[in-house]
Amino acid sequence: MTSSQSISSSADTATHYQVLNITSALLDTQHDSTPLIKRAYHRALLRNHPDKVANSDPSSVFFTVDQITTALNVLSSPSARVAYDAALRVSRPTGAAGRDGSFQTGVENVDLDDLAFDEDQECWYRPCRCGNEHSYEFREADLEEVSEEGELVVGCLDCSLWLRVHFAVLDENEDDVQPSSTTSKDKI
């Protein structure tokens, strides 16, 4: 791995780019990045082969075939890569504080109760400072997917800003907060 990509201390926290030992910037410069990704995939398989791993430096980080294959699949698909890059930007520490801090550049924290609900479209929404009145928009199904975490990260439809929506799932029979895998606008 190059020194710029060895920022990960373990195979569990490595990005797909680190697994394949390539950079996003390199892929962005390619008209068709598929051959480059495939070459990186084959190199990663050879570098992390079990026969070679057993004889190498124990302090080195090695990746599994599953990690390498997942990296190939995500980075080879343009739509999956765009979604992955967006998720990386949100999860990386930025600005004055990291993931555990209260401030991240381009990410605003709000409570679900502070958002408007459109009955006709059955979605929550909020305007963005870029001017779009419905720039942050999501539905009940989006909340259900992340009900265990209690937060949903939504990107603006028109710019690069993000909204982290915090919520709690309430039991229908009680007003107490209950861990649940179902969410409804009436329960929230």
Curated annotation (Swiss-Prot):
Per its UniProt entry, which superkingdom is the organism in?
A: Eukaryota
Instruction: From the UniProt record, report the name of the gene that encodes this protein.
Output: DPH4
- The UniProt record lists the J domain at 15-88
Main function: Required for the first step of diphthamide biosynthesis, the transfer of 3-amino-3-carboxypropyl from S-adenosyl-L-methionine to a histidine residue. Diphthamide is a post-translational modification of histidine which occurs in elongation factor 2.
Q: Which PANTHER family match?
A: DIPHTHAMIDE BIOSYNTHESIS PROTEIN 4, DPH3 HOMOLOG-RELATED
Where would you say this protein principally sits, based on its record?
cytoplasm
> By what name is this protein known?
Diphthamide biosynthesis protein 4
- The entry marks the following residues as binding Zn(2+), namely 128, 130, 156, 159
Q: Which residues form the DPH-type MB domain?
A: 106-168
MF (Gene Ontology): metal ion binding
From the broadest rank down, the organism's phylogenetic lineage runs: Eukaryota, Fungi, Dikarya, Ascomycota, Pezizomycotina
Does the record carry Zinc as a key word? yes
* Subcellular locations according to the entry: Cytoplasm; Nucleus
Coiled-coil spans in chain:
none
